[in-house]
A protein has these predicted regions:
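Conserved beta-strand scaffold positions in the cores of enzyme catalytic domains, especially
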Residues: 13-15, 47, 74, 167-170
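Short charge-dense sequence patches
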Residues: 24-33, 60-65, 145, 152, ...
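Short, flexible, glycine/charge-rich loop motifs used to bind or transfer phosphoryl groups or to couple energy/partner
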Residues: 3-6, 35-38, 91-95, 116-117, ...
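Generic alpha-helical secondary structure signal
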Residues: 9, 31, 76-80, 84
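Short acidic/polar micro-motifs at solvent-exposed secondary-structure junctions
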Residues: 18-25, 48-80, 90-104, 129-147
Length: 172
């Protein structure tokens, strides 16, 4: 299967990568998406910002409130991600995740590592133990940001443009 064909809208997706002096930037600024929509109007149906995948350490709290340290491959996404990339939700709600501050969505494989059943992941807490460099003004140096798992989605294949050949485990 070719890149991105796992998504329902693959034939209408456009991947924009930004570079500054030859260095790839890790995400797309909101202003660019707004500008593209304004300038190209009817040609842009929707947009979503996705930061490149990177590993992030978390403490995950289990059913009995045990704290377990894990490092997950994470991407930062906005609330429109599901409109373009059509992930299949197997537990919880994308809508709740999109409108809840500090919500995360985890993949089915990640849920299986942590809990006996996908549904048991919903409402559980994950605390990031390091800084998010794409949001330096809002992230404490030591991390400490608490997230709540609001949805579990089917695994995202490794052959997608947003994380080519890397296994995504958590969407922040």
């Amino acid at each position: 299967q070719s890149v991105d064909q796992c998504f329902n809208n693959y034939h209408r997706l456009v991947d924009i990568n930004l570079a500054d002096e030859g260095r790839m930037l890790s995400g797309t600024p909101a202003i660019l998406a707004e500008k593209l929509t304004k300038e190209y109007g009817h040609e842009v149906e929707a947009y979503s910002r996705v930061a490149y995948a990177r590993q992030r350490p978390f403490d995950v709290y289990t059913n009995d409130e045990k704290k377990l340290p894990y490092t997950f491959e994470c991407i930062e996404v906005d609330s429109f991600f599901n409109r373009l990339f059509t992930p299949t939700v197997v537990a919880g709600s994308w809508r709740v995740a999109a409108y809840t501050p500090n919500a995360v969505v985890i993949t089915e494989s990640t849920a299986r590592k942590l809990f006996p059943y996908n549904q048991e992941a919903i409402g559980k807490r994950m605390v990031m133990t390091s800084k998010i460099w794409s949001s330096p003004k809002t992230t404490p140096d030591s991390g400490g940001i608490s997230y709540t798992i609001q949805a579990v989605i089917k695994d995202i294949p490794a052959n997608v443009s947003m994380n080519f050949m890397r296994t995504i485990e958590v969407l922040i």
